Amino acid sequence: MSSTGPLVCTSIAQVREQIESRVARGARSVGLLPTMGALHHGHVQLARRARDENDLAVVSVFVNPLQFGPGEDFESYPRQLEQDLALLAEVGVDLVFAPDVQEMYPDGVPVVSVTSGAAGGVLEGATRPGHFDGALTVVNKLFTIMAPGPGTPFRAYFGEKDAQQLLLMQRMVRDFDHRVEIRPVPIVRSERGLALSSRNQYLSEEQAEHALVLHSTLRALTAGELTLEQARQRVDAEPEVSLDYLETVDPRTLEFVAPEPGALALVAAWVGPTRLIDNMRI
């Protein structure tokens, strides 16, 4: 990495050339962190893992329109590439792939895309139809673009906060036989427990205070202090918070199960106009 920060590639051809060149010059492994930018400390932890565990660390920054449904925040989603680059420079990331929509989808919406199936139609997928299809499609494309070739380990890093997305990415890799290893990274939280998210910056101070109910309720539920229904009522009773779902699932399949050891509790709620998610193992 240069002393001025990561090299920014805006075209597929350029980032491919850089990866191929650096592998040829001795990089023995490649780590990829796919993001939509608006990076926070949670992303920094993911990027640091990619940096520490690989010779070449690559971060993609692309606000993917396929992941946003009608009425969602695609146009207003924060875009702050210079700030993102400053954070990634501190970590020591080597390459940043920051294409525009035309570069990734030159013909508009792709004719061929990845579908998430039944596991992508529940929980987040029920509220945000098509979201996971869009996420899988772009990451599938990123894997194809970035893969260094046989013989060079290729690892991709995903946060456990997006538990459903993580499971679907793991399934896609298995189903498509991608030469990439998915490495999960634990949730990063604020000092008071709020899961870090790019959308947290939408919250007022008062809303951020109310949002803490998500973490505190998950802790009470996983400790056996609340039933599932009591946990739902507790979240919904919080001012400015509107519950979307609070469920416990088998983390391997996303099938709904009772709140029992080994299950995963997932919550999604609107805090004011901002939608937040969180999860915790029982």
State each model region's role.
Residues 2-240, 249, 253, 273, ...:
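Nucleotidyltransferase catalytic core that binds NTPs
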Residues 239, 258-261:
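A structural signal for short secondary-structure junctions
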Residues 243, 262-264:
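Active-site lining segments that contact anionic ligands and/or coordinate catalytic metals
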Residues 246:
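Substrate/ligand-engaging "lid" and interaction regions
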Residues 255-257, 264-282:
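Short, basic/aromatic-enriched C-terminal tail that caps enzymatic domains
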